[in-house]
Amino acid sequence: MLDVTTFDELRIGLATADDIRRWSHGEVKKPETINYRTLKPEKDGLFGEQIFGPSRDWECSCGKYKRVRFKGIVCERCGVEVTKSAVRRERMGHIELAAPVTHIWYFKGVPSRLGYLLDMAPKDLEKVIYFAAYMVISVDEDARHEDMPGLENELRLEIKTLQDQRDSQIAERLGRLETDLAALEAEGAKSDQKRRAKDGAEKEMGQTRKAFDEDISRLERVWEEFRSLKVGELKPEDAVFHELQDRFGIYFEAHMGAEAIQKRLEAFDLEAEGELLREQIATGKGQKKIRAIKRLRVVSSFLATGNSPAAMVLQVVPVIPPELRPMVQLDGGRFATSDLNDLYRRVINRNNRLRRLLDLGAPEIIVNNEKRMLQEAVDALFDNGRRGRPVTGTGNRALKSLSDMLKGKQGRFRQNLLGKRVDYSGRSVIIVGPQLKLHQCGLPKQMALELFKPFVIKRLIDLSHAQNIKAAKRMVERSRGQVWDVLEEIIRERPVLLNRAPTLHRLGIQAFEPQLVEGKAIQLHPLVCAAFNADFDGDQMAVHLPLSVEAQAEARILMLASNNILKPSDGRPVTLPTQDMIIGLHHLTTLKEGVAGEGRAFSSVAEAILAKDQLSLDLNAKVRIRLHDIYFGEGEAPEGVELDEKGKTVGPVLLETTLGRALFNETLPVDYPYIEAVADKGKLSEIVNDLAERYPKVEVAAALDRIKDAGFYWATRSGVTVALSDVLTPPTKAAILSGYEKQAAKVQGQFEKGLTTNAERRQELIEIWNKATAEVAKAMEDNLPADNNINRMVSSGARGNWMQVRQIAGMRGLVSNPKGEIIPRPIVHSYREGLTVAEYFISTHGARKGLADTALRTADSGYLTRRLVDVSQDVIIREDDCGTSRGLDLPIATKGADGSSVRDSNVENSVYARSLAADAVNEAGEVVAPAGSDVGDVMIDHLIAAGVHEIKVRSVLTCESAVGVCAACYGRSLATGKLVDIGEVVGIIAAQSIGEPGTQLTMRTFHTGGVASADDITQGLPRVQELFEARTPKGASPIAEAAGRITIEDTDRSRKVILTPDNGDEPHIYPVLKRATLLVEDGQHVELGQQLHVGAIDPKEVLRVKGVREVQKHLVGGVQGVYRSQGVPIHDKHIEVIVRQMLRKVTVVEHGDTDLLPGELVDRARYNEVNRATLTEGKKTASARQEVMGITKASLATESWLSAASFQETTRVLTQAAMEGKSDPLMGLKENVIIGKLIPAGTGLAKYRDVTVTATEEAKAERYPNRIFTDESVFNESDLSFVDFDSFSSDDYTPGTYN
């Protein structure tokens, strides 16, 4: 059936004024919201019912029409349509602006799209838009050219007239001066008076000359401006411009504000501009070419989409529905309102004032000021604070604009579309439930009743315990007896989901069958704690209820805890026995010498148990017990024991073992080889690993439960306790320390005599004290008796490690100062002895730094996970096989000194769980395994035994699927151990596998004993981030750009490494820091890509010099290096998925005859497709350069604008996408979650949506043992959808419902 939400693409574009008017249901003319007396929305206001619909269902504003029977009528009195009030969530209004305004996203975003289109600097744009300068819109070139001679003559004439006037006025004044001087002479005036008269006249003449000269120069400037006038020029508002407008206004048009921009955009010829820019790109160089490329990108997007650039200037502002910007009455009668209403109010007020001023014909300066204020009001509405100071509300808080509603963690995308709260859920504290089976959890009765309430109510009515819903509800609220019976029936075989935050990987949500328990705490199976990273110190967990039959099926089949035994990150079991269980099993399987019953023989385990109960036999005594039908692994059977072909003993066998070990083996499957060893942490891990490989999950889960039960049982009986007397300080400690004290004093003495430097002294002291600490630790371990409880806990792997014991019983050792440098004086006391004040003080630095670091790490690791998920969320298994013959050559073994093959230590996480891309051939040239074979543990052993050292395996890095990856290249799913299914979201699993252990990685750089040096290499989490972001590392080492010979030039100030290539090219010069440690010597021959000094390498350089395969190796190896150093196993294929995403784009260098733009980033798949099409037409193909992008940049460069916008830089992404008229193909997960569709992965894939399931008779009988369906009208199979396993929810099918 087709759904309304079934569409393939989602496009975003630029809305024109007509679009906005089409969406609108009326114009908002008044800034009023709600009438304070009647509390009804004001007419034509921001909440007007005439525009947005009635505020009460089926009722007009004046109350003339009430009830649903008047549906669709528009009241003639108040003008309100009678309909549901829900329309107030979807009906929009609009504001008709009295003057156009620019959209701030297009003008102020970086880069400024308007600026690129009009080829203007953002500064100049701002001057025009905010009324600080005029912009020339058009010039009538023909008329100007035609009239130029006449106008020039006129102007010259005017200038001549002015000059004549000036000269005549000066001459007249000179004449007057002479007359005055003659008169003064006649009067016999003093020389002072004459001089004053002369000075006065000269001053007057100067002023006259200056005034005339200014007029003449102004005319000349006006003329020059007129002659050189061109479109797009900016003119300040001054006398020259006003004169220019008065004199030559008919030849040109100049405007201010958004109106100017609008007129320019309307007259803009996109095609001509595109041609011009292509020409510039072909001929230009440097900055000019780069700018032309950027401008062409903007021009092309408008040409391609048919969007009108004039839509970037608004004449109409849309008003969003009132329910999305609500106004609510508070208790005190005051109102709380959304900030948007204030911002809309400002726009309406200013718009109305401007309209009034225009009607009154106000002076231009006042009108312009009002237009500028309107522009600022609309800016604040769209993106408050983007330009100038933000508009603030009460308490100086910046108001939340439309952009802020979308941005960030609290924005619409991340808060409401990607993370919704769900119904049918609860949360409570967790406690341990050791009696549970692996697939069960304990659900508090009250909680279960609340969660299943609707189902309980329905069942009560079906069973006639209640007549109607109200009565049933009352029964539930009063907790009647029948209610619990019904709840018990409903809950049977109905899975619930348990989730513990933070959900770092997919094992953070698992399904369990609930068991009703008393109390209010959820009971959790102890073996699943590791997957949830849960402990019982107050952790809480949430419970969710899968409702539909499909959801229940998925929960039971895919998410049940007993089906999730393996970790998706490395394929190893996650449900390992821990702590109490380990100590119990260790106690059970230990062998003790000289204890009761040693050497006795028993006819059966039962007889041995009897002897133990009678206290004549110790659990750990070495005895002989007759056992039947036991299995042994290859070469493990005792001498003289006969085995059949399956490894099973023929007849009974008298086995030398302990009773404990015999009991332990009873917990394992019948045909599992007999374990004759101490079950410590390592051994148990091996056993569980083996079980997971050999047996179906049901069998493994049962065995794990038996192991768990045995562990707890014997832990209780082992009586393990800890007292202070168990912490034994080694008696030789003082003697050991005094010896090292002497050595330290000697080193200090040498330093004081000036024989060694401070750095050498520190280094030597650190080495001395490290040796001392190690020796004390060794003495302490030797001093602890084997049956010491602390020793048992640590050596069995149940809890703690020797370092912790050493600090309690031996000595604390060296600690570091706040800078991270090691203090060369150790803490010689242990916690058992107590620390001195100074020792306590210096040890607090490290402890506090540890806590601060952990807090930082958690946040950093979370952000890394988010970026990884974002970049890889559309990597889904899309096909079975892409058909490529490419692959990676990976080592599986090396040749030992004796010629034998030594297994490579990283095989588990490199070639394991993949398939061969080519035949595996040994040195003799024999094919050991054909291409396409699955590489598992058995196959690896087989290959190594046959002498194969390197194999070529399929990898996602070489997969040629256009979208997602193929199953053959990915290989086995590590979580199931089988070939990955189509629809598996391998991208997100990869991101979780890398991100989940992120918190365990150390922070910052490591300092090598003391002062920071160039050897400080970024490690831990920051290094992983540096690699995934493809950043140039700090102090990056250059790599040889060709094979050649090295020359080192050393001067006082600097050092250079010069590489002379073998092929006679120009030498390459690398400046190197003086303190850097070189890896090459003078005169040495180096190969292409060889590192020149100690430090990290820039991935971009590796790509440029050595190519794609090498940069892939560099990134995968670098990330693995960090995780391995922390002992965290992650399979290479997860890192490869991310690296594939980092390398999927290419930059177009030459566009040839394709429609690609030079400098454009395109998907490699699209680039190849375009080139293929161009080749078939016989045209010139494009050429491109491979790019390595950081994960943040790669996430933003995705094809999906929805995914990019919900990740980061929301406004920038949306601006660009709207301008380009982008279509979202809805291939990834996020975009489908945002629009509320099923994700195109797993069971949400289209191919899995049309499966019909029919229930067998057996299944029906199983579900309803007490009912017989004979009546066709009651139970018509064609009306139902069934799931072919025995777990229907009890409320799904009830007689009498489906007729």
From Swiss-Prot:
* Cofactor notes: Binds 1 Mg(2+) ion per subunit. Binds 2 Zn(2+) ions per subunit.
Q: Which GO terms describe its molecular function?
A: DNA binding; DNA-directed RNA polymerase activity; magnesium ion binding; zinc ion binding
**Root EC class:** transferase
InterPro entries named in the record: DNA-dir_RpoC_beta_prime, DNA-dir_RpoC_beta_prime_bact, RNA_pol_asu, RNA_pol_N, RNA_pol_Rpb1_1, RNA_pol_Rpb1_3, RNA_pol_Rpb1_3_sf, RNA_pol_Rpb1_4
Q: Which residues bind Mg(2+)?
A: D535, D537, D539
Q: By its UniProt entry, which NCBIfam families does this protein fall under? A: PRK14906.1 (NF011498), rpoC_TIGR (TIGR02386)
Q: Give the protein family.
A: Belongs to the RNA polymerase beta' chain family.
- Listed name of the protein: DNA-directed RNA polymerase subunit beta'
The lineage is: Bacteria, Bacillati, Actinomycetota, Actinomycetes, Micrococcales
